[in-house]
């Protein structure tokens, strides 16, 4: 967990830094404060709904677990600390790999561009939280012409530091509403998480 770099001198290993991060702390809060409670309600919820698919964001296991008619997003508006934990936890490093290393945007987009169009929509991250994937996309492909757009509910977009780096646009939008931005490559960030 720590390395001795000299007599009486120590430094943290990467794992120690990860364990001490705000993102991991927030992830632990989400596990205990939301997920555990939701998982405990899941068997009864599934039985009550005869194990059928549920497509109503206000009729999920979350409502049963928290005894509310609010969607998780509406609920979080009234519980800002939980909302902050959710946004911070979304910044956790994904150990299964980096999607940017397997998605060659420069090749795909570069082959489609005869003349770079800075007004063209390049990337939309739907439900992208604090914009970490948009930022990583722009850092990886700084020379690709086009707009990079972060979409999330207004309560989340209001927490995003402004202005965003590299011209990234933060736009309030619920994925339940029709998509106003047309793009060939939207990214719905971890859809399974959205359907809690």
From Swiss-Prot:
Pathway assigned to this chain's UniProt record: Secondary metabolite biosynthesis; terpenoid biosynthesis
Domain of life: Eukaryota
EC number: 2.1.1.-
Protein keywords: Methyltransferase, Transferase
GO biological process, one term: methylation
Gene3D superfamilies cross-referenced by the UniProt entry: Vaccinia Virus protein VP39
Biotechnology and industry use: Diterpenoid pyrones display various biological activities and FDDP C shows anti-cancer and anti-HIV activities. FDDP C also shows inhibitory activity of 42-mer-amyloid beta aggregation that is involved in the pathogenesis of Alzheimer's disease.
Family, per entry: Belongs to the class I-like SAM-binding methyltransferase superfamily. Cation-independent O-methyltransferase family.
Listed name of the protein: O-methyltransferase dpmpI
Organism ancestry: Eukaryota, Fungi, Dikarya, Ascomycota, Pezizomycotina
């Amino acid at each position: 967990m720590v390395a001795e770099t000299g007599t009486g001198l120590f430094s943290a290993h990467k794992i120690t830094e990860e364990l001490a991060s705000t993102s991991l702390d927030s992830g632990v809060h989400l596990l205990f404060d939301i997920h555990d409670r939701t998982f405990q309600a899941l068997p009864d919820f599934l039985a009550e709904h005869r194990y059928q698919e549920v497509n109503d964001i206000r009729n999920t296991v979350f409502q049963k677990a928290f005894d509310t008619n609010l969607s998780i997003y509406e609920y979080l508006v009234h519980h800002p600390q939980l909302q902050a934990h959710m946004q911070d936890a979304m910044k956790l490093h994904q150990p299964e790999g980096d999607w940017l290393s397997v998605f060659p945007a420069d090749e795909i987009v570069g082959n489609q561009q005869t003349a770079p169009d800075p007004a063209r929509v390049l990337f939309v991250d739907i439900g992208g939280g604090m914009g970490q994937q948009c930022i990583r996309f722009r850092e990886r492909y700084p020379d690709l012409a086009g707009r990079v757009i972060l979409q999330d509910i207004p309560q989340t977009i209001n927490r995003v530091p402004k202005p965003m780096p590299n011209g990234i646009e933060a736009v309030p939008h619920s994925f339940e509403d029709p998509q106003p931005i047309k793009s060939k490559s939207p990214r719905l960030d971890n859809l399974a998480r959205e359907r809690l």
